[in-house]
């Protein structure tokens, strides 16, 4: 990397970091952190543990924003100093170090930009992602299992705790439905753009004639509400069914009815949880999912988008697709909203979907 190229990069990074400073309002940010720390120092702080944890989480998030900004600013100053020294006297080792620092700074800035883009009210929350194959039988159900693998790999690679809440086996292969919980800060913010219909084009391994098939699978994403948001659900409005349940692939089938299915009669929303060992645990998880769906339903009504959040999307077909995954006759994954695309389809199916997530966040600003 030439020094002139490094200089141009650092000038661009400097503009971005100055923009971060303006958007963050550092003085106000420092005041907010100080106020929260003062609250945490009070003797009665832990009297309400749920409220205390919320304050701690907010404080940690603000500190992370502040510390990350300061770290980027320090890196920029060090890089600028090294550049000045190299312009006066060449030093091969120092130039290699500067190139590495410039690359690392660019990566930090990109990550920080994403953090700033996660500015919706529920972006910081955990997420529940549901996969529902459309019509197409085994081929569509196998596509659902491929998406499940893609998302779980993405979550694990990014340090999220990934938990299967409910899993229903496909008739021959794949799955009929799955609900996956992602635990970690900003899980919903990163995943909310994955909601929609995902289209697969490939030569089906289940077709003896080796014909090309097109399959559709619906992905739904909702925030997992915390205790700060109350959703009232009347007992009279909920029908509960219990059934025997087992893990993915038919493992550990229970001899008692631990699986729980909840139906919200007024809206027709159905949720279920099967992966906990107890009926009580599955009921709690199913109720949390139901509350999230009801809350999101109300939010979508205000935005005139209620049809997208009634448990199952109305039609899993061409019209509502957000992304196409083409294996044959060529290899390409393309997002129909942002235009972002890649030919590295194997990497995408292994969970490398950051490019699509980042492109959506920028597109949706």
Curated annotation (Swiss-Prot):
Q: Which domain of life is it from?
A: Bacteria
Q: Which GO terms describe its cellular component?
A: cytoplasm
| Principal location class | cytoplasm
Keyword Protein biosynthesis belongs to the record: yes
Matching InterPro entries, A to Z? PCRF, Pep_chain_release_fac_I, Pep_chain_release_fac_I_sf, PrfB
Q: Which keywords does the record carry?
A: Cytoplasm, Methylation, Protein biosynthesis
Location in the cell: Cytoplasm
Keyword ATP-binding set for record:
no
Q: Name one GO molecular function term.
A: translation release factor activity, codon specific
User: What post-translational modification information does the record give?
Assistant: Methylated by PrmC. Methylation increases the termination efficiency of RF2.
* SMART domains xref list: PCRF
Q: Which residues carry this modification: N5-methylglutamine?
A: 251
What role does it play? Peptide chain release factor 2 directs the termination of translation in response to the peptide chain termination codons UGA and UAA.
Question: What family is reported?
Answer: Belongs to the prokaryotic/mitochondrial release factor family.
Name of the protein in question? Peptide chain release factor 2
């Amino acid at each position: 990397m030439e020094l002139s190229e490094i200089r141009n990069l650092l000038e661009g990074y400097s503009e971005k970091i100055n923009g971060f400073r303006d958007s963050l309002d550092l003085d106000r940010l420092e005041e907010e952190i100080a106020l929260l720390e003062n609250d945490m120092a009070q003797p009665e702080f832990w009297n309400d543990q749920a409220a205390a944890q919320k304050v701690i989480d907010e404080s940690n998030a603000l500190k992370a924003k502040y510390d990350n900004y300061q770290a980027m600013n320090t890196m920029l100053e060090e890089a600028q100093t090294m550049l000045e020294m190299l312009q006066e006297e060449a030093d091969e080792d120092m130039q290699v170090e500067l190139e590495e620092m410039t690359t690392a700074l660019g990566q930090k800035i990109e990550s920080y930009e994403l953090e700033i883009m996660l500015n919706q009210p529920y972006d910081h929350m955990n997420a529940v992602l549901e996969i529902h194959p459309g019509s197409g039988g085994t081929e569509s159900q196998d596509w659902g299992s491929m998406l499940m693998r893609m998302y779980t790999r993405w979550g694990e690679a990014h340090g999220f705790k990934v938990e299967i809440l409910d899993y229903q086996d496909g008739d021959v292969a794949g799955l009929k439905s799955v609900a996956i919980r992602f635990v970690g800060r900003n899980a919903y913010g990163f995943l909310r753009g994955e909601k929609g219909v995902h289209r697969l084009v490939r030569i089906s391994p289940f077709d003896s004639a080796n014909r090309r098939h097109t399959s559709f699978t619906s992905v739904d994403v909702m925030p997992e509400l915390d205790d700060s948001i109350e959703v009232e659900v009347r007992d009279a409005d909920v029908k509960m069914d219990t059934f025997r349940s087992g893990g993915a692939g038919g493992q550990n089938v229970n001899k008692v009815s631990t699986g729980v299915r909840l139906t919200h009669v007024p809206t027709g929303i159905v949720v279920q949880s099967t992966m906990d060992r107890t009926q009580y645990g599955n009921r709690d998880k199913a109720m949390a999912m139901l509350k999230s769906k009801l809350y999101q339903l109300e939010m979508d009504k205000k935005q005139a988008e209620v049809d997208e959040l009634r448990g199952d999307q109305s039609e899993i077909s061409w019209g509502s697709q957000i992304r196409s995954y083409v294996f044959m006759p060529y290899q390409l994954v393309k997002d129909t909203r942002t235009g972002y695309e890649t030919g590295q389809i194997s990497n995408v199916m292994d969970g490398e979907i950051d490019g699509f997530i980042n492109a959506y966040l920028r597109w949706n600003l």
